[in-house]
């Protein structure tokens, strides 16, 4: 045999990553799409599976015939973009205050390299981890498969020891056995469990068995979670029947620029199972004790200071998701034809026609009518609409999409808030009660059946989809920049609206359902549908006053009854018999609140959904947000959303102890508002002219109503 020559390139790994990153940015050969909040990230399934144990577990658990789209909802889009950039470039840039959040995300995703990068940058993290002796080498072994355990008996130090992400819970197959079948090893796990030994060196390879051609279903093996198995591959995939508890959902009623959901549950909507990593309360590290997140939904009533003990809000079972709370709002989307083909339910695989009412009816089949729990993840809800909206996330069928950027949403309420997020001069929001004839002159070429692009002079048909298609011609999608002025934008929707400004065309958007129009006649017909529902539905026969809310109407009639003894039956004054069967939207809360506030001495507020009564407005508003899913307070550190001001203040104390108020001039932190006010006095003469003390709050208020009670 002649001389053997070894040819090796040190640049090959880096060049390979660069090419993969180019393919990702240009969406070339991408076989999976990760949906985080309102953004979609195309990627390569093999790259994600090799870089993060969470994705490896997720892809193997869903099977080969699963959909290409997966939802990751325990991370913000901005942070996931940074993590994805690290996967493809091995580099990550973030603020110092965000390191703790990135570190926790790396733990939940199972990204060993990112954890090591955090340890190398902050040596204190390495010293706080109670490292265990490794039982196997990490980089020389391949063909690994793991399941993160949710058992609290494993301290985080064991999971971070050395170069192994999951410590003793993650075991490796020797290189000679890397080509073995995963299904084969899974069947041998149970038989090898009784023969596993703790050895100080890598174990011998497991015995070979006959090959199995038929794939075996993934099963949960709770007994394997209590002890590490050496010489085998731990394959206890977590399902809804395992001991892995579903994560809390952190949903909000208003959305930031980059996200509309920041939940803490790792529920894969493509399968309806909980493929979740170890819970955050089971993965606390003393080194990051000050940055640990506090699940404020688990606080007792005394901690909230104003909560009614009868509400049981502090129970760990309660998970409130975004809900439109109105059956009528969904009716507007039936004619939109957003989904032109039947889609399978990701829970039971039943093929569902693209009809909103049928899909919602099918969602009720996955709700236990006796207990009010979700049959998929056993989450409990108090009201029916929240249950249905929650189950829609398991079904995995997006019912609504943005006309401009085609971002998918589960509810119309989420879509409407997404469109309200950006303010653009060429996007004119039209309300149902606005006079349309006065806006006729704002339409580009109102008297002409065609439109003309001001950027290139091309003649376009007066159709929004044609205009949208032409906008893409003036975009640099790869660089996410405008081809006319080279301005870059963080998200596609704002970029497309910006590019539309160069075209000289105005688009009118419906304030109710976010539909867009460039033809005045179509807009007029569409708004007529909303105007018929926006008209006053309740009329008083005594004084000719009109009301949109049944609660406000009934209270008004009760005043007549007190004064003149007239009949005030519940149906008195109804002009439309169909209203007896009509379910009122969520505005019934607001109508009742306003009616009761207007009367001095009245200290009771009654919820029309559950019948509970409250003595103060703050209590009633907090309770109302439970039914609507609104969380108007957002933490500036970890971007989580909360219902009340008291809860966000308690949460801020978990970030380094006293991140309550931050000076906008020098960045100084204060624990109380009085201390911050005194500190601001030092900067007299250098403060901006529009400075207000509210700018120092370490939380964002997304609701004007919630801003009525500022800090004192």
Curated annotation (Swiss-Prot):
One Pfam entry name: BTB
Localization in the cell: Nucleus
Domain BTB, chain residue ranges per copy: 30-96
GO CC terms: nucleoplasm
This protein's UniProt keywords: DNA-binding, Isopeptide bond, Metal-binding, Nucleus, Repeat, Transcription, Transcription regulation, Ubl conjugation, Zinc, Zinc-finger
Entry keyword Transcription: yes
GO biological process, one term: regulation of immune system process
Covalent cross-link site, Glycyl lysine isopeptide (Lys-Gly) (interchain with G-Cter in SUMO2): 183, 439
Protein name: Zinc finger and BTB domain-containing protein 39
